[in-house]
Amino acid sequence: MQCALFDAGRCRSCQWIEQPVSQQLSAKMTDLQQLLAAHPVAEWCAPVSGPEQGFRNKAKMVVSGSVEKPLLGMLHRDGTPEDLTDCPLYPASFEPVFAALKPFIARAGLTPYNVERKRGELKYLLLTESQLDGGMMLRFILRSEAKLEQLRAALPWLQQQLPQLKVITANIQPVHMAIMEGEREVFFTDQQALAERFNDVPLWIRPHSFFQTNPTVASQLYATARDWVRALNIHHMWDLFCGVGGFGLHCATPQMTLTGIEISPEAIACAKQSAAQLGLTDLHFQALDSAEFATGQGRVPELVLVNPPRRGIGKTLCDYLSQMAPDFIIYSSCNAQTMAKDFGHLPGYRVERVQLFDMFPHTAHYEVLTLLVKS
């Protein structure tokens, strides 16, 4: 992938960009094989990859510069701002949005937040696009509520320019720290969630719910988990750290009892909405801590699917899964190091199948799906 920002030394986020994608994939496979060297793997599936550019459905832009000439991108370590609106990881559909947002910031009088001086209002712009219909969610991350009415008054102009903006919000983040968002969300649109669809499964994206940034590869990840579960003829499963329900909704059948657990109430609201659309009545999504839920249950499911954050599931949950002993565990990981460590705490299971998903081209990161079978 050619990138003018990288060539000019202005951005180094894609550290592997100079390697061909095939070479990147080989290096990732080697890394994964080394991490799992202590665990014999019965079947290595071919890695899955997607487009090498224009694949992101989300932009997280630091707003800097001046109100008349805002920059949308990032801050270097020394505080120097960098405009990244030309980043080739973004689809072409983002270009007109960035182009309209710059004059809009001036029209609305949203002074970019200056980290050094601790002054200004607009900290970040977060943009998410649905693959279903090109609808978008735009979030203004503000330091305070001081400019809310000014922003509200200016929005009709922006909505006229960009009718694809289906959900528009302001998030209030008053803390002078590198925290992306605060708890208070103010909606400027009647619509509060973005409709998405992967493999004919309806999904919903709300402001505070996590959603994968590479939809092409994510849809293949969910479809693979579905195929693995269907082949096992499962009637009762848990989906822990379920997010908006991507895995559980793909795996569920009308004959199956499924419980999905996620700490975020917003994500659970999305999952419930999808389950209702699919007419699946034996799906139960609850906003709880996954480890606390699991350790408090009596009835043992045949399969437990886990999709934890980078820290992994940890020894406590591993020990409980070992004690509970479901027949199968499907582990989806964005950090193979912590996944391998967790496998060390699951001695009663063998690694049946492993597949790498190249969710983050041009970087060392990848996603991996693993099927564990009770020995």
Swiss-Prot record:
S-adenosyl-L-methionine is among the record's keywords: yes
Pfam families: tRNA_U5-meth_tr
Domain of life: Bacteria
Keyword Lipid metabolism belongs to the record: no
Enzyme class, first EC level, given as a word: transferase
One GO BP: rRNA base methylation
Annotated catalysed reactions: uridine(747) in 23S rRNA + S-adenosyl-L-methionine = 5-methyluridine(747) in 23S rRNA + S-adenosyl-L-homocysteine + H(+)
Example GO molecular function: rRNA (uridine-C5-)-methyltransferase activity
Keywords: 4Fe-4S, Iron, Iron-sulfur, Metal-binding, Methyltransferase, rRNA processing, S-adenosyl-L-methionine, Transferase
Function, in words: Catalyzes the formation of 5-methyl-uridine at position 747 (m5U747) in 23S rRNA.
Protein name: 23S rRNA (uracil(747)-C(5))-methyltransferase RlmC
Encoding gene per record: rlmC
